[in-house]
A protein has these predicted regions:
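Asp-based, Mg2+/Mn2+-dependent phosphohydrolase catalytic module
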Residues: 1-3, 39, 113, 117-215
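Alpha-helical elements of Rossmann-like donor-binding domains used by nucleotide-donor carbohydrate transfer enzymes
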Residues: 22-26, 51-55, 72, 93, ...
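Short, acidic loop-to-helix structural element flanking the phosphoryl-transfer center
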Residues: 79-107, 113-117, 145
């Protein structure tokens, strides 16, 4: 086993797609814009919620209603991010095993900071996930290594003996930029072929398989 496990959040630990799509479509409808399908939203996520809305809103950042629509999304999502969101099957058991073995664990997400903190505290608590880093104005988001470096600093450890776990190409690039291996999960927002095309080397089909991957 590794010494330190850094996890992505959406599509890796938590199934968040339905709540993200609901808030996205609420904001779009509120501003007279066409709705997006669940599959479209699945493709839009991974680079933070601002990028999600940039992709969902017609003409993106050039739309004069972009800022209002984005704020409508944020406000709705903070009220509704627990409506259907839940850990994937096997995630809680896997995190408890890591805790039992004395492993260091953090979450590093491109989800905005307040939502990352709220969701991690609600579902996992400080015992299972003592460090949770979300998107903030003062630090570059993934795939830049900055948020991973900050998580390692808060865990009082280094990239040596650490592994990054995620469900997307952004996570593969983040791991590479952070100088650590990546475990790609197959239950998230991207499929196996997509992950392999983007450089995935270690793939797992269930959370408990993460525990079996050796350094």
């Amino acid at each position: 086993m590794y010494d330190t496990y850094i996890f992505d959040l959406d599509g890796t630990l938590l199934s968040t797609l339905n709540d993200l799509a609901a808030s996205c479509n609420y904001a779009l409808a509120n501003n007279g814009m066409p709705q997006r399908t669940l599959d479209e939203v699945r493709q839009f996520v991974g680079n933070g919620v601002k990028k999600l809305m940039e992709r969902a809103i017609p003409n993106g950042l050039n739309n004069p209603l972009f800022d209002k629509t984005y704020q409508d999304f944020r406000q709705h999502y903070m009220k509704h991010n627990l409506d259907t969101t839940c850990p994937y099957d096997g995630v809680m058991e896997m995190l408890k095993e890591l805790h039992k073995h004395g492993k260091k664990v953090a979450v590093v997400s491109n989800k905005f900071y307040a939502a990352t903190q709220e969701l991690c505290q609600h579902f996992f608590g400080k015992e299972l996930v003592p460090v949770a880093i979300g998107e903030r104005e003062d630090i570059r988001k993934k795939p830049a290594p900055d948020t991973v470096i900050e998580a390692l600093r808060q865990l009082n450890t280094t990239a040596e003996g650490a592994v990054y776990i995620g469900d997307s190409d952004v996570d593969i690039d983040t791991a590479r930029n952070s100088g650590m291996p990546c475990i790609s999960v197959l239950w998230g927002f991207r499929d196996k072929d997509f992950l392999l095309q983007h450089g995935a080397t270690t793939l797992v089909e269930k959370p408990e398989k993460i525990l079996k991957v050796k350094k």
